[in-house]
């Protein structure tokens, strides 16, 4: 029956949109306007990862880098370095000239001590007197020369740029880069992007109000359009490369794209073929949020690619801890962009869009399958951190969606009196996926199959038959568990071997914790786990709710986090949608989540934590997303009861809060 829409609801929608529009204007005037008329910033240096260095000294007194400037109206170049043993008479000459004609655009010679006389890294700036007109696509030569250096040594941060850098120290093809920042143009040109963002948010808000409040649709019905629209907004806000390790995931997806398109592999296992324009775009994108990425999104998405020839370049493969299947959506999107001859930016965005489609489809399937907790699962999938990962090229899009489906299947089959064959087939597939993903840290989730194989029949006259069937399935489950464990050990044996290597604790803290050491000191493990919870527990919760997005570049206010947490707790206690399992099932679910969390802690302890620390490093809230549908269901209790009629208000509160979060992220991360 069609639900009648009242005039009051139209008035409520109008007022909500009016208030949100006013907030958009307020954010612009209070936070964005004051940052206008500043140069755009392009980070050429790799961030959040290990980098190399070049030493300018008596042994190598001059460095010269020839690069293609891809930015218009170049204004300033910044180089990061640290000076050591700076001699009193040492002089440093800095020159920026045309790489072809030799015309000088910047030239300065200073005593080395004035430029840098510190053991702390510092950015040395070369600011042009006037913006360099026509700098885009111009070859430039950057030269630093040290004179009378004696013991002086400048340790300059460096990385590799495969296409943009033409030569280094006159070595053609050497992509060594020492430039940290390029500042160019004016960020005022990005105001239009903010206007489009606000328009998209208002459309999203109106759509959600219409579907949830006016039409009264269930989460199964409104989830797909809501997730797709909000996911696309997140893609524009968190551009290519701004999600942790996304460049590595794009490299891996590109490898599978080559296989889809029957591109031959290189002779070197550490290189692949890529389009020149795609490599160039990767060189232009940084590991983080910056105005340059927003500018590229605005100007390069719908352009014609300049060079689609294939070139052999180094790449990083991230498929060792996951099945290659998780990269298929992104690889398909990249392949489509290459076949259609689209720009590099649009090709990479298509990879992200296909990943988003996979995440939304898997999450929606889980919502359809799960017998209870539908609203909780939908709200979890729409959390900022879930959408950030789901709308990126990261394998987390498929991994998180796949785990959601597995948990939903276990709960569904545990509730049904008669299970279907397709459910067992699907359960086996996703159980295999669970066992062979992320180093096996989520392997304890297989305990949830107890819901399936340990359930009791509700009819007395079928008890004998049920016992026979249960025995058969328990044997099958046991065999399957052994096979899955063997597959897990086989796939992750190289990683396990590195963890199992014995190692001595180093006095300087440069070593890592190892499994043999931890086995010999079990109390040390207890202390490390406890200290981690006490010191970092608030960060885990905050980042799980979306409190630290991108490469932790944006920190969300706890005001937003409280709303998201409250929404999840209320969703777990909605009428006709709360978990109604017995005590044994709750204990099993809690044990599965606790064991997985313990393995996550252990993996980061032996794989990331220096042995001079008394807590575990590197753990983020997003690592617990695959467990969320299970452990959040345990929040259901008799003290909280949410009536069905209150569902729409809770959903709109959470979604409007997410809109406000996006506005704050745009303002604080430098969209303009």
Segments (PLM) and residue ranges:
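Beta-sheet-rich sandwich/jelly-roll-like modules and their strand-loop junctions
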Residues: 21-100, 118-120, 130-136, 145-200
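Membrane-lumen/periplasm interface segments of multi-pass, membrane-embedded glycan/lipid transferases
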Residues: 486-576
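Start-transfer (signal-anchor) and selected internal transmembrane alpha helices
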Residues: 1-28, 189-232, 470-480, 583-590, ...
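Interfacial juxtamembrane loops and adjacent helix segments
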Residues: 260-350
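Membrane-interface alpha helices of multi-pass inner-membrane proteins
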Residues: 388, 423-439, 444-450
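Transmembrane-helix signature of polytopic, membrane-embedded enzymes
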Residues: 218-221, 342-345, 364-385
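Perimembrane helix-loop-helix junctions
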Residues: 409-418, 442-482
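Transmembrane-helix motifs of polytopic, lipid-linked glycan transferases
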Residues: 207-208, 346-372
């Amino acid at each position: 029956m069609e639900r009648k829409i009242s005039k009051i609801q139209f008035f409520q929608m109008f007022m909500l949109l009016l208030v949100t529009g006013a907030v958009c204007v307020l954010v612009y005037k209070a936070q964005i306007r004051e940052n206008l008329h500043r140069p755009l910033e392009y980070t050429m240096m790799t961030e959040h990862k290990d980098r190399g260095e070049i030493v300018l000294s008596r042994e190598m007194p001059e460095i010269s880098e020839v690069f293609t400037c891809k930015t218009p109206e170049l204004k300033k170049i910044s180089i990061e370095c640290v000076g050591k043993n700076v001699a009193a008479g040492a002089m440093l000459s800095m020159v920026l000239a045309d790489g072809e004609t030799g015309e000088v655009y910047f030239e300065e010679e200073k005593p080395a001590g004035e430029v840098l006389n510190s053991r702390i890294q510092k950015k040395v700036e070369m600011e042009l007197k006037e913006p360099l007109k026509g700098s885009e696509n111009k070859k430039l030569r950057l030269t630093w020369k040290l004179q009378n250096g004696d013991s002086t040594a400048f340790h300059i941060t460096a990385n590799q740029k495969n296409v943009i850098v033409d030569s280094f120290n006159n070595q053609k093809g050497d992509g060594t880069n020492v430039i940290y920042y390029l500042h160019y143009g004016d960020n005022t040109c990005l105001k239009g992007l903010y206007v489009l963002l606000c328009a998209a948010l208002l459309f999203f808000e109106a759509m959600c109000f219409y579907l949830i409040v006016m039409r009264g649709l269930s989460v199964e019905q409104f989830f797909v359009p809501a997730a797709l629209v909000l996911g696309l907004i997140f893609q524009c806000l968190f551009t290519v490369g701004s999600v942790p390790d996304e460049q590595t995931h794009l490299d891996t997806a590109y490898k599978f794209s080559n296989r889809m398109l029957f591109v031959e592999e290189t002779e070197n296992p550490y290189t692949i073929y890529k389009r020149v324009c795609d490599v160039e775009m990767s060189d232009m994108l940084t590991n983080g949020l910056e105005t340059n990425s927003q500018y590229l999104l605005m100007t390069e998405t719908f352009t014609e690619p300049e060079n689609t020839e294939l070139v052999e370049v180094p790449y990083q493969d991230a498929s060792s801890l996951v099945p290659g299947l998780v990269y298929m959506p992104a690889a398909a999107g990249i392949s489509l962009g290459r076949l259609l001859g689209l720009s590099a930016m649009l090709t990479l965005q298509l990879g992200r869009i296909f990943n988003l489609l996979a995440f939304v489809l898997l999450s929606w399937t889980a919502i359809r399958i799960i017998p209870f907790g539908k609203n909780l699962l939908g709200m979890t999938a729409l959390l900022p951190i879930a959408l950030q990962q789901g709308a990126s090229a990261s394998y987390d899009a498929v991994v998180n969606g796949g785990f959601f489906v597995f948990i939903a299947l276990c709960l569904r089959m545990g509730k049904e009196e008669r299970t279907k064959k397709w459910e067992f087939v699907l359960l086996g597939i996703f159980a295999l996926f669970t066992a062979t993903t992320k180093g096996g840290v989520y392997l304890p989730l297989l305990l949830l199959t107890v819901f399936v194989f340990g359930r009791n029949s509700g009819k007395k006259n079928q008890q004998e038959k049920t016992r026979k069937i249960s025995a058969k399935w328990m044997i099958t489950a046991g065999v399957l568990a052994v096979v899955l464990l063997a597959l897990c050990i086989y796939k992750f044996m190289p990683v396990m071997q590195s963890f199992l290597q014995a190692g001595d604790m180093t006095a300087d803290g440069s070593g890592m914790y190892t499994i043999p050491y931890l086995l010999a000191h079990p109390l040390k493990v207890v202390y490390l786990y406890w200290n981690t919870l006490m010191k970092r527990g608030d960060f885990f919760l905050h980042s799980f709710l979306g409190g630290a997005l991108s490469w932790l570049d944006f920190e969300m206010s706890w005001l937003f986090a409280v709303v998201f947490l409250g929404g999840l707790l209320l969703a777990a206690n909605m009428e006709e949608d709360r978990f109604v399992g017995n005590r044994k099932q709750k204990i099993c679910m809690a044990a599965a989540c606790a064991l997985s969390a313990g393995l996550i802690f252990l993996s980061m302890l032996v794989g990331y934590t220096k042995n001079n620390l008394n807590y575990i490093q590197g753990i983020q809230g997003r690592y617990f997303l695959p467990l969320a549908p299970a452990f959040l269901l345990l929040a259901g209790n008799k003290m909280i009861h949410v009536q069905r009629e209150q569902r729409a208000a809770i959903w709109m509160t959470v979604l409007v809060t997410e809109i406000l979060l996006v506005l704050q992220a745009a303002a604080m991360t430098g969209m303009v």
